[in-house]
C-alpha cells in the first residue's frame, strides 16, 4: 500500500512538473530542485556508483570523467536559469 502511494505521488509530481513548464523549461531552486531531481532519478532507475566501485574495476583514473556532470553546475543551469527535464536527468 505504501509503495502504491509513493508511486502515485511521484507520478503526480512528475505530471505537475511537466504541466508547469512553459515551452519545456522551468526554474528549480532549493528544496524543489533536490526533490525533483531525486524523483526523476529514482523514476529513471539511475544507480550512482561510488568511487570504491570504480576502483574495484581497476579504472579509478576514469572516475572523474565517467560520473557525468558534476553537482556544482546544476544550480547555475536550473536555478539561475530555466532548464528542461532532460538537463535535470543528465545530473542523475
Swiss-Prot record:
Subcellular localization: Secreted
GO cellular component: extracellular space
Entry's transmembrane regions: none
Cystine bridges: 29-79, 41-92, 78-83
Signal peptide: 1-19
GO terms, molecular function: growth factor activity; hormone activity
InterPro entries linked: Bombyxin, Bombyxin_A, Insulin-like, Insulin-like_sf, Insulin_CS, Insulin_family
Source organism, top-level taxon: Eukaryota
Residues that make up the propeptide removed upon maturation: 50-70
Keyword vocabulary terms for this entry: Cleavage on pair of basic residues, Disulfide bond, Hormone, Pyrrolidone carboxylic acid, Secreted, Signal
Modified positions (Pyrrolidone carboxylic acid) in chain numbering: 20
Family to which this protein belongs: Belongs to the insulin family.
Subunit and interaction comment: Heterodimer of a B chain and an A chain linked by two disulfide bonds.
Function, in words: Brain peptide responsible for activation of prothoracic glands to produce ecdysone in insects.
Additional notes on this entry: Silk worm has two kinds of PTTH: 4K-PTTH and 22K-PTTH; there are many forms of 4K-PTTH.
Family matches, as PANTHER family: INSULIN-LIKE PEPTIDE 1-RELATED (PTHR13647:SF4), INSULIN-LIKE PEPTIDE 2-RELATED (PTHR13647)
Protein name: Bombyxin A-4
Organism of derivation: Bombyx mori
